[in-house]
Design a protein with these regions (language model features):
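Charged catalytic cores and adjacent phosphate/nucleic-acid-binding surfaces used
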Residues: 1-5, 9, 13, 19-25, ...
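An N-terminally biased module of ancient metal coordination in phosphate/nucleic-acid-related enzymes
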Residues: 1-78, 83-85, 143, 185
């Protein structure tokens, strides 16, 4: 199945231009079989006093997407995009998170990368650095990452796919692909080709952490080119 591993909805991500229903409707129209809903988790969305009520809204948005997914025939995976408070250029995608994870681990954005990675490992989650070169950012310490993302958002000018795969190969990291879709530009057609039997976030994490080869499609924002590729932790190959 073809899954965009990085999508937002307007119910939580205030920079997203439309609500969950339109996000899923558009994904279905563009041929996706599933989405990872990774709304922003950023410090200016809450205070320590309002965290509990805000996180319930975050969870409710996940659940709304799960219900809409049934209507549209889309597999929905729960994910989180954490903006690191110590350097707001750094956004970390968490796959495998669920309601208990968010309720039991507050203020993730205030953690160091090492602390966040430790929390993810304790809870069976995978930690991926999103758009690792945006705004002059660099790939962070691979000891505290499971992977790095090829990001197809049209506002980012280039996906850095070759660079991401080269670094991932050297550092034995996984590669994920997502469009970071906010409905603020055209709908890119980038994502991962995943086994149909993946039913939820834990299945997704198990696959991402154990697969030796990943197959995906990149929608290159620089020239609107769409191509498929595969990545092995030792080798990488452009298919077509």
């Amino acid at each position: 199945m073809f899954v965009d591993l990085h999508a937002h909805t307007g119910g939580i991500s205030t920079c997203c231009k439309v609500g969950a229903d339109k996000i899923l409707e558009t994904a279905k129209e563009y041929g996706f079989d599933g989405l990872a809903i990774a709304n922003h988790y950023v410090r200016n969305y809450f205070t320590e006093e309002t965290y509990d009520s805000w996180i319930e809204k975050y969870i409710a948005e996940w659940n709304l997407c799960m219900e809409l997914g049934k209507e549209y025939g889309l597999r929905i995976f729960k994910a989180v995009e954490v903006t690191m408070e110590y350097d707001k250029r750094l956004h970390m995608l968490i796959y495998g998170a669920d309601e208990a994870f968010l309720r039991n681990n507050p203020l993730l954005c205030d953690k160091s990368l090492a602390e966040l990675y430790g929390i993810c490992k304790e809870n069976g989650c995978a930690l991926i650095q999103a758009h690792p070169f945006r705004s002059g950012a660099t790939v962070q310490d691979a000891n505290f990452l499971d992977g790095i993302e090829i990001n197809c958002h049209p506002n980012y000018q280039i996906s850095y796919a070759d660079r991401v795969m080269e670094i991932a190969q050297k550092k034995n990291l996984m590669v994920t692909v997502g469009c970071d879709y906010h409905a603020d530009n055209y709908r890119p057609c980038g994502g991962m080709f995943l086994p149909e039997e993946l039913k939820d976030g834990k299945d997704l994490v198990n696959y991402l952490l154990t697969a030796k080869e990943y197959h995906f499609q990149v929608h290159e924002p620089q020239d609107d080119r769409i191509y498929q590729a595969s990545f092995r932790r030792e080798t990488q190959e452009i298919l077509a």
